[in-house]
Every structure is written in structure tokens, then in C-alpha cells.
Amino acid sequence: MESKKFRTPSQSATVIVGTQFGDEGKGKLVDYLSDKYDIVVRYQGGANAGHTICFDNKTVVLHLIPSGIFHKGCVCVIGNGVVIDPAALLDEIRKVEELGYEVTGRLFISHNAHLIMPYHKLLDSLHESAQGDQKIGTTGRGIGPSYEDKFARKGIRVVDLLNPEVLKEKLRENLAAKNKLFKNIYEKEEIDVETMVREYEDFDKIIDPYVTNTQLYLNRQLQEGKTVLLEGAQGCLLDVDHGTYPYVTSSNPTSGGASTGSGIAPNYIGKVIGVCKAYMTRVGNGAFPTELLDETGERLGKIGHEFGATTGRKRRCGWIDLVALRYSLTINGVTEIALTKLDVLDTFEEIRICTSYMLDGKEIHDFPTDHQTLSRVTPLYTTLKGWMASNAHARSFSEMQPEAQNYVTFLEDELQVQVTFISVGPGREETVFR
């Protein structure tokens, strides 16, 4: 009897994850790789994350639409794990079209993605203000409250925009509860239901061309041999399950979140590329063992232009932390590393690398994810000689300064993962592939 032949998943999906506290430079890598993939997918987060892309003497920041939209042969998908501010999305679509790029037919939005409504943003700012010294440091974009409604099974989804009667009923239900909070807890004016219904009554016509069942679309495209690049927002150390809780985001930026946030079956995922800066930054509150509260930290921030792409907030800066990186590489199953912003270190005579921590008089090599313990550790450093010159001309590893090569090799030896992508400047072409 002849044996049957069944389809075997191709593992032609690649995930890009941030391995630090976000802002690692994922946008540049996605932009660089997008012309090598058929589809680029955003799988979690919302407009709280900005991906900065530099090309053709332009600098563009995208918050929701994947960076691949600037590669004309690439299809872009906003997955079910993303929370979407409809007004922000339409503004972004207009911005991309004004730059001369077609969006209709190239952008698909999951019908199951949840929406950020105006009351989510108001709740976000009111709740954050009420926290006093215990603030998380949210962006105030309504991300957390939208995810809260999602998991409380009260959320409004993209598909609801296409049915005005369903949308109206869900808005009434949500505002009945939210207005009690505004009036009785926060002593704010209630939001008028009918006004909000009118605000969203035309969204069905505008957004309908982009909406589809992206879970089925993506899996079918993979079955047909197409390649998919999945881009996360934020970073592993901000993951709600695996990060420095409670100073985390409300979603899963880790590689596991790529599957749940897109609907792509896990066995289609082949490579996981972990993106990390050559130093480290963090926005908002929370433990940061290698933070530099001195002139060196200020210098890193100034050279690296470390201000949030979404909020404009100043980022806290410090040396690279290999204890945290080892943890991130492990839980994400990272197969290769993309090292960004190496050029920021070009003028430092010495570069310090955290290789372990001291905790209660003992050296430890494992990253503590509970905030109380992490806030008590002291970093232990190895110091390397700086290269004191630019690598912007380099297009191969051998063309880089010897001390810069030594820095990269040291990271590889410590982390036991190859660095395959090195950003030596902000431009698309200022990149070394190995």
C-alpha cells in the first residue's frame, strides 16, 4: 500500500524580537530585511512603540503599520495581537500615502484586533496620575486599558467597526461602566455615548478595504511557500509575563507572542533574530542595573539621540548587560543577534560590559525577574579598549576597526550566539552583514 504524503510546514517565518527594554533599533533591521520577505507582520503592542526608519534622506516613524510598507513588493499585516487606535491608524495611512507609497491592497488588518477608544486613553492618564511615586511610566496611549478590556472580554474589535449597530451597543455597554469611574472615582465629566457613536459612524467605510481574517491569510500564504517576517514592539524585558513586572507593557513582545499575536502556527517559525543595542536604555520607571547616572550616561544619550520616538521622553542610558541578554536569548530561542547603534560607542576610550551581578555578597549569572531582587543587584564589569574611530565605511566585518571586531567577538563568546547584523550608522546602507 502506497504511503500518503502530507504537507510539512516550511519554517519560512522569521521573528524579530527586542532583547532589552525596547528601543533596540528593530525598525532598521525590519526595513533592511523587508525586501527579502513577501509579508511583514506586526504582532503585538500598539501606538506606544515607534519604529524609526531612515532612507532616501528621510526619517520616518511608524507606530502601527509594519516598516515593510516602504518596500513596494511587500505586503504588511497588523495582527490580532495589536491594539489599534483607529484615528492614529488612519493618520499613519495618510502619512505613508503622502510619501508616495500605495497602502490599499498592501495592508491587511486583523478583524480580531482590539481597538483603543478615547476612554482608554483618558483612563490611562488618570490611573497613571493617581499612582504617584508608583507610576509605571506608561505612554498614556491607552494600551493597558485596551488590553484590560480585551482580557475582561469587554473589548471592541476591528470587526465591530464594520457593524454600526453592534458598535453602538458595545459603546453603550462600555461607557455605562466607564462613566461611573469617571464620575464617582476620578470626578471627571462623563463621556456622551451618542457623540462617540457619531465620531465612529464613518469608520466602517474607511477601514473595510483593509480588514480580513489575517490568521487564515497568513497560514495559507505560508502553505503556498511565501515568506513572512514578524516584528515585535518593545522588548523582552518589558514582557508582561517574562519582564521586570510590574514595570512592563501589557502584551508579549517575546517570540512566543509572535504566534499568538499573528495566528501563525509555531511550526512555521524558523529563525528568531534578537535585536540589542551596543549599550542599553530604558524609558520610564523600573530597575536598570547598568544605568549610568553620570556624565557617561548623559553622553550616551546625547550621541545616541535617546529620546522616545512616541513620547519624546528622555531615555535612561547604561552599559550593555549580558546577564539580561542571556535571559532574553534563552526564553526567545534566539538563533542570531542583530547588534545596533555600535556607532554610538565610536568615541569612547573604554567600553564596559556587564557579565555578572553581585547579590547579597554572592556573584550570580542568572537574571532575577522579580523587581525587588533586581533592584538590589550590583553589576560586575569587564572593560574593553574602545576603537576611537568610525566604522560607517565598513560593509564587511573585516573592514571594521580591530577593537570593534574584538567587542563583537567578546559578545559572541559570552552569549554563545552569532552576531550576524551590525548597524554602524543610522542609514539603511550603514550595515555590516556576516
From Swiss-Prot:
Q: Where in the cell is it found?
A: Cytoplasm
EC number, UniProt record:
6.3.4.4
Extract one GO molecular function annotation from the record. magnesium ion binding
Q: Which UniProt keywords apply?
A: Cytoplasm, GTP-binding, Ligase, Magnesium, Metal-binding, Nucleotide-binding, Purine biosynthesis
Name a single GO biological process. Answer: 'de novo' AMP biosynthetic process
* Subunit note: Homodimer.
Q: Report the family membership.
A: Belongs to the adenylosuccinate synthetase family.
Protein name, please? Adenylosuccinate synthetase
Tell me what organism the protein belongs to.
Answer: Pelodictyon phaeoclathratiforme (strain DSM 5477 / BU-1)
The top of its lineage is: Bacteria, Pseudomonadati, Chlorobiota, Chlorobiia, Chlorobiales
